[in-house]
Amino acid sequence: MKVLMSIKPKFVERIFAGTKTFELRKKLFKKTIDTIVIYSSFPEKKVVGEIIIDRIISSAPKPLWESLKNNLGISEKEYFEYYKNSKVAYAIKIKKVIKYKKELELKDFGIEKAPQSYQYINWRE
């Protein structure tokens, strides 16, 4: 199963460049997911590619930072600000990234509004 996930453009760039090999989240999917369809949020507002998931790591924020900080594509300040009220941090390990040749619109998925975090989808390119 796939999810459409909103990711800030600066992090999308780092994912495609290979400098960000984990996607961070505060909450995790309730269903088993193998692929994340990347929605590059404002100002791009385009569906730009896919992430094939390797595995998901969960931990308290501090030890997760200590073990993965060089692969997160985020500053220490940004990281701890993001997780400031969280007891658990989730790191989605990226196995493979697929960049679409042609960017897509949300309407191509039958979606009118971008998800705040993620949305389950049934779709194949």
Feature locations, PLM:
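Short conserved beta-strand and strand-loop elements enriched in small hydrophobics
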Residues: D34-S41
